[in-house]
Amino acid sequence: MAILNEEWQQLLADYRAYHDNPLCEATHVIGIPMIMASLPAMIVPPVGLSLFTAGWALQFVGHWFQGNPPKFFGDRRNLAVGALWWVDTALRPTGLNTRLFGRPVPPSPTA
C-alpha cells in the first residue's frame, strides 16, 4: 500500500521529470543526504554548516547542468519532495519504491 496520496504522488512525478539530467540527478543523490544529515549535525556547528553549505552548493550546480531553477522556488513542498525523491531513487533497484510510493504516475503537463 502506498504511503503517498495522489497529490504527493503527482508532486513526486513532477519532481522526477524536472530533474531528468543525469548530472543534476547525480548532484541531488549526493547533495540531498548531505543537507538532511546537516540538520542533526548542527549540534556541532562547523560540521553541520559545512554539510549544509556543500549540499546546497551541489543542488545549485545540478540545476546549472539541468538549466532550470530549483523546483522549491515555485512550491516549498518540493523541499520535502526532494527527500522523497531521494528515497524513491535509492529504493528503485529493489522495487520497494513502488510499494511505498505507488506506481509512478506521469508528470503533469506543467511540470
Region spans (language model):
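Interhelical loop and helix-boundary elements at the membrane-water interface
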Residues: 18-27, 64-77
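Transmembrane alpha-helical segments that form the membrane-embedded catalytic/substrate-channel core
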Residues: 51-69
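Membrane interfacial helix-start motif at the N-side
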Residues: 9-39
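Structural signal for membrane-spanning alpha-helices in multi-pass inner-membrane proteins
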Residues: 39-42, 59, 63, 89
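Membrane-proximal soluble regions of multi-pass membrane proteins
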Residues: 1-14, 68-111
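Transmembrane helix interruption/hinge and helix-loop junction motifs
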Residues: 41-49
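Hydrophobic alpha-helical transmembrane segments
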Residues: 26, 48-53
